[in-house]
Amino acid sequence: NCHVVSYKDTGILIDAGLAGKRITSGIEQADFDIDKIQGIFITHEHSDHIKGAGIMSRKLDIPIYANFKTWCGMKDKIGNIKEENMIVFDNDKTYELGELKIRPFSIPHDSEDAVGYNIYSDKEKMSIATDIGYITDNIRNNLKGSKLVVLESNYDPNMLMMGSYTYALKKRVMS
């Protein structure tokens, strides 16, 4: 789980769930200037969303943004981050970074305090919500007016059942 969102000279990562080298390689393959990445916005503390966050923050000297509960759940998993690069935000407030405005909103997930993001340029709005099992009224309201919506809430039932997850985790994923 890792998305690059850019507008003009501002780029951000939504999650960094891959190894840092893989994120860097993907950005380079997309012919995007990695130096335009100005921050990493985390949706929740699960490893498939934070694996490369610390590495990318240290490599690019950029901040990681997450709400308080997510920071509490991930700070021991991402390595040492400069204090000035540890940004705690409040859900449902709008933050500016370069030429983008980013507004986190709550989503249901079995994590500390998962969020989706509304991202605004001076022209358009886009929304990203990952690991959602169902659409709540809050999600529906936050997606309204978006020119682009990225939703991720799937799994392959055969892969899941044949995989090495515990039965309890398989039941959670299927819920």
Predicted segments, located by residue:
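Active-site environment of divalent metal-dependent phosphoester hydrolases
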Residues: 46-50, 71-73, 111-112, 135-137, ...
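Metallo-beta-lactamase
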Residues: 68-123
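Hydrophobic, well-structured mid-protein blocks that either form specific transmembrane helices
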Residues: 105-149
